[in-house]
Amino acid sequence: MGKKAILLLLSAVVLLASCANPQQRDNSLQCEKQTIDLPGVHNARQLGGYVIGDKKIRMDLLLRSGTLAKASDEAISALHDKYKLALVADFRSSMERSKAPDRDVEDAINVWLPVLEKKISGEKVDTVMAALHFNMDNPSYTVELLRQQNIQDALSTSYDAIVFDEDCRQSFADFLDSLVALPEGRAALWHCSHGKDRSGWGTAFLLAALGADRSLIVDDFSISNIPYTNEIEDLASIAREEGLEDELIEYIYLLRGVSAAFFEKTLDAIDSCYGSIDNFLEQELDLTADEKQILQDKFLE
């Protein structure tokens, strides 16, 4: 979706008054501090309160999560009433959306910005990634897959695929454009299926645009392991029982949670190719200095 289309869509939601929720003052980068109460929505949290330089991210405006498909009525009401949600950015594939469509939130637009569409459900589907993606509920089969070199290769480069694929970059560029166009005082929520990898990279690019340092970007990305601790530990336990080598356990984090190690490798690749993540934002996501300033003025205090 182009910048003009996003601007036209978002202009339709500016009719309601912006909310003025009390600002909570807490700097701690802890899962429980960032978690928001959205029953039925996995890994729901906000960026509000993060310290960037001598400023903080405003509370209750920037939300990230898993799919809204099973969001409760209470969650939908909170998104409308408390957060004054204006935008939902959905990074899932067409197949994921058709199997589990988001619930609608009144007065919010839902923008489809697919990341890894071709690899998961497109015409050039990557059978390796598809096998992993759609067999998440079969632990023994998953462990067997992890023994295969092609699976290991696909997993070890999965973050690179998210960042360096042209279509994925366009979706992230449109995501940042949508935040530039977001009405003042209104919230945005972005998600994929589980709110960890694709949502995590979208968050990383946003945090970088807001001026966050690398440690904050990595810490926020890593928080996604906490809501999925049980799933990670359960699969790791089964894997060890079935004799999976210790060095392959890291791949379980890529499947059930996130891998900070592989995340940082891709950040290193960005630095190597572009000099810095700021240069990547400018050269590949077409984020101008003026747009970056708009984001900082809008979301920092």
Where are these regions (language model features)?
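C-terminal motif of bacterial Sec signal peptides marking the signal peptidase cleavage site
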Residues: V14-S18
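Cys-dependent protein tyrosine phosphatase-like superfamily
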Residues: C19-L189, W201-E301
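Ser/Thr-glycine-rich phosphate-binding loops at phosphate-binding pockets of nucleotides
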Residues: H194-S199
